[in-house]
Design a protein with these regions (language model features):
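Long, contiguous alpha-helical bundle segments
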Residues: 18-235
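PEST-like, low-complexity acidic/proline-rich intrinsically disordered segments
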Residues: 1-22
Length: 235
């Protein structure tokens, strides 16, 4: 495991490891259509369409199809719209666009996420790849960080012992704080607490109870977390 992967994996909360991952992996996920109109079930359906190759790698086109123009839609739910939600949506969309541009220019070579990273690093060197804001490596790294933020937020929400505002602040601390300077950490860290009530979030996810939302969130976690673990391990 690379130093980058080790550093990032250490930031995950305990809830993402061991029992939870094993439990949610047993949940049924529909392959025919989303189980509901909720963003959680919509994302579960599309992420569930990502099928590893015979070598166990992640097809780049399936990865992009799952997340482009979809992954950003929950920020308004989690943060009630406004400037922070807009910034987070812009960040994940820019990262996905960076990956897509590199893939579109190299479809014959960048067939899987693993091949994309391996080929680019071999050609340019890891240091150069991760300094270049237009590289596939940096686009994929920040895509991972954004998706890890969303997955971790929902893992905390499932536990139910924190308010949404506490979930937001803790998730930021776990997943993104280390990558921001002091001023950004202060401003963004405080803004992460501007979340709607749990009841409002449940309603915005199109559910009536915490239990219904938790079931859908667990389905989402079940399909997404293993892919995130696989992605960061190759960075």
């Amino acid at each position: 495991m690379s130093a980058l992967a080790q550093e990032t994996n250490e930031s995950k909360p305990v809830v993402t490891e061991g029992g939870l991952a094993e439990d949610v992996a047993k949940l049924s996920v529909s392959e025919d259509k989303p189980l509901s109109e909720s963003w959680l079930d919509q994302m579960t359906f599309h992420v569930g369409k990502i099928k590893l190759t015979a070598k166990g790698e992640i097809p780049t086109d399936q990865w992009l199809n799952a997340f482009c123009d979809r992954a950003d839609k929950c920020y308004d739910i989690l943060f009630g719209g406004g400037m922070l939600a807009g910034q987070l949506k812009g960040d994940i969309n820019n990262s996905l666009t960076t990956v897509k541009k590199q893939y579109d220019a190299n479809k014959d070579k960048f067939v899987t996420i693993e091949q994309m990273i391996e080929i680019e690093v071999k050609a340019r060197g890891k240091k150069d790849c991760f300094k270049d804001k237009t590289s596939a490596c940096i686009g994929q790294l920040w895509t991972y960080r954004a998706l890890n933020f969303l997955c971790t937020f929902m893992e905390y929400m499932v536990k139910g012992n924190l308010t949404p505002s506490q979930c937001g602040k803790q998730t930021y601390k776990d997943c993104l704080e280390r990558y921001h300077g002091w001023l950004a950490r202060t401003a963004v860290g405080n803004a992460m607490g501007w979340c709607p009530t749990r009841e409002k979030i449940i309603e915005s996810f199109l559910f009536k109870t915490q239990e219904e939302m938790a079931e859908a969130a667990n389905r989402y976690i079940a399909v997404l977390r293993p892919l995130l673990n696989q992605v960061i391990a190759i960075m």
